[in-house]
Design a protein with these regions (language model features):
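ATP/pyrophosphate-binding catalytic subdomain of soluble kinases
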Residues: 148-186, 195
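Short coil/turn connectors at secondary-structure junctions
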Residues: 24-28, 67-72, 94-100, 104, ...
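Thiamine diphosphate
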Residues: 34-109
Length: 244
């Protein structure tokens, strides 16, 4: 379903390993958003729904309120965040919805299938070649009020499994970011490597550091990419969630 080495399948594997260990298969409900993450709901033999562009978190939150015993997980990507401005995540955090939101950060903010998705603050047109991040995802999640925040890469499926066990056991909103650059996006520049080489390259740029302040986790900053579970920034509030 997904390209070899794509982090979506690995994140899904980590989720099902967590669910199997917890024995909550019958309670699980999975929602998926736009793009490649939208394929997730089509492939599962559990309660699942592909909610369409920009509606996955809101639909999952509504489902969870009506089905209080459900363990509800949402898979979204960068396009979903840009479509809503993260307003659905902010609203779920304010309402203390028991959701686990898994964000596949594929580092793409350009045209997809001929359609222009919402733009980053750094480009006038999505047709302009470039890769930029609109905001620091862990910091934005903390400012919105999420209780559990983590970031992993595809080489850390075991760590992500443990994080998801904690998230599925926690109350309120949990946000887990999977940094997995899209491999198809690099084919036009002839920079694509094999799956193992790609994941190893990303892993070599990574460092695991727990409880690091979320404001220091912007991927645009030089140095290692920090993975782990993170400490909240000072204070929280939806009005500041787009601080960069």
């Amino acid at each position: 379903v997904w390209c070899s080495g794509c982090g979506i399948g690995i994140a899904l594997y980590a989720l099902f390993e967590a669910v199997r260990e917890m024995g909550i298969q019958s309670q699980l409900c999975v929602f998926s958003g736009t793009g490649c993450t939208g394929k997730i709901a089509e492939c599962l033999n559990v309660s699942a729904c592909s909610a369409g562009e920009g509606f996955a978190v809101a639909a999952a939150a509504e489902w969870r309120r009506k089905n209080v015993q459900s363990k509800t997980v949402v898979f979204i990507n960068n396009a979903d965040i840009l479509l809503t401005g993260a307003s659905d995540i902010i609203e779920s955090a304010k309402n203390q919805d028991d959701l686990v939101v898994i964000i596949i950060n594929n580092l793409i903010y350009t045209l997809s299938e001929g359609r222009a998705y919402p733009l980053t603050p750094f480009m006038r047109s999505s047709a302009v070649f470039g890769v930029d991040l609109p905001f620091n995802i862990p910091y934005a999640a903390h400012r919105a009020g999420a209780g559990l925040i983590a970031r992993w890469n595809p080489m850390r499926a075991g760590w992500m499994r443990h994080t998801l066990i904690d998230a599925l056991s926690a109350e309120g909103l949990s946000v887990v970011e999977m940094v997995s650059p899209c491999i198809v996006f690099r084919t036009d520049t002839k920079e694509i490597l094999g799956p193992v080489e790609r994941m190893s390259f990303l892993n070599d740029l990574s460092e695991i550091r727990y409880e690091k302040p979320s404001r220091d986790l912007d991927l645009r900053h030089p140095g290692k990419i920090i993975f782990g579970g993170f400490a909240p920034a000072e204070g929280k509030g939806e009005s500041d969630c787009h601080d960069r």
